[in-house]
């Protein structure tokens, strides 16, 4: 039989349905893989072998009774920013090191309804703030393609576990590129859905107007199958859009002849490596060969301001969202003083890591009385201009094509001393969050043995369009089938 850890969701489902494979066998194979590789990859914060095997047994019983859905019995992992009832949810922070939520996130319930098997929770940058997973308070995740390199962030553990075949799929969150950038660095498929497409209920908030939950998978078909399970309206999330989600897997069929694709010039900036740009040009050639028309002269002039806008708006929202961690209600509490104000101050000083404290201070400054108009209000105005530019572009184009990142996976420790250099890793992904658009990163080749990602951007709620283009690309190439030697 095919190596079980190499199977996609679709392949696993077929074998499970035909009773040629059991979920228990599939789950045990992935737990064995985790046990073997975790000392080197360090993708998981928490592994749940007993409950995973129990869920697999239940899935096998359901299949025996003829009750099987596309994700029934499929082993998966969750970024440790999604609440899981009875399983600790740390956000890779000392502040929540021992926090066990009393409820599940909406997407966790949806996957449970499907019968998916939860292997464990994955490592991340603390409170989803970072681009390398080095900001985890506990340990750094390593890139499966080169363990001296970072896997990207903040969802580095979720990307690495799929790339290393420790899970068939995983979920992450994306605030400024935290699904797409690690998907690029780890050579997997990663989708940031349209804002409001997937409920954020039970997602520990970083920046509420930017956060979105999405999948990491081995290919676009698997991505569509996961989206079929998690997308849709949820009245517990005020930003969830009240509309019926499409059948994403059925949208993949058909060619892309006649599709109009735009290539924004601003995404090939001075900090873009020439060899990455060359790989993207090769990918554009593939899309052109599939019948799409490619316009390389698109301009989105406000793109250079997106990074500054993001680092005003996101920290401002984080400053408000993280004010709840005061040591009083839950989480870490400094209890070596009887003075309440000192206890709160010490709780936050000791519970939060350096990057989280940096962003809280930036956000608090931007929201302060003397600077609110000069910084926060102005950033919101520029956000509107960026969104309008995208809207204008989508009147002419079906999708926009860019690199996912301007750089290759970098060495662990290389950028930690320079926060600005780290922030620059997300220049191609941040504008999409600012505008609330869907975007997908898919493997597009390698440079010096390290992965390069292709980003496909769509207009709001045209997630199925970008997935169709991505699927067509994967049908014409084999980059997504490459796996690291571990």
From Swiss-Prot:
Q: Which residues form the active site?
A: 79 (charge relay system), 154 (charge relay system), 178 (acyl-ester intermediate)
Single GO molecular-function term?
ATP binding
Keyword annotations from UniProtKB, A to Z: ATP-binding, Ligase, Nucleotide-binding, Protein biosynthesis
Matching SUPFAM superfamilies, A to Z?
A: Amidase signature (AS) enzymes
Assigned EC number = 6.3.5.7
What do the Gene Ontology cellular component annotations say? glutamyl-tRNA(Gln) amidotransferase complex
Q: What class of enzyme is it?
A: ligase
User: InterPro entries from the entry?
Assistant: Amidase, Amidase_CS, Amidase_dom, AS_sf, GatA
Reactions that this protein is recorded to catalyse: L-glutamyl-tRNA(Gln) + L-glutamine + ATP + H2O = L-glutaminyl-tRNA(Gln) + L-glutamate + ADP + phosphate + H(+)
Output the GO biological process annotations, alphabetical, semicolon-separated: translation
Q: Which family does it belong to?
A: Belongs to the amidase family. GatA subfamily.
Subunit (UniProt) = Heterotrimer of A, B and C subunits.
UniProt function note: Allows the formation of correctly charged Gln-tRNA(Gln) through the transamidation of misacylated Glu-tRNA(Gln) in organisms which lack glutaminyl-tRNA synthetase. The reaction takes place in the presence of glutamine and ATP through an activated gamma-phospho-Glu-tRNA(Gln).
Protein name stated in the entry:
Glutamyl-tRNA(Gln) amidotransferase subunit A
Please name the source species. Answer: Dehalococcoides mccartyi (strain ATCC BAA-2266 / KCTC 15142 / 195) (Dehalococcoides ethenogenes (strain 195))
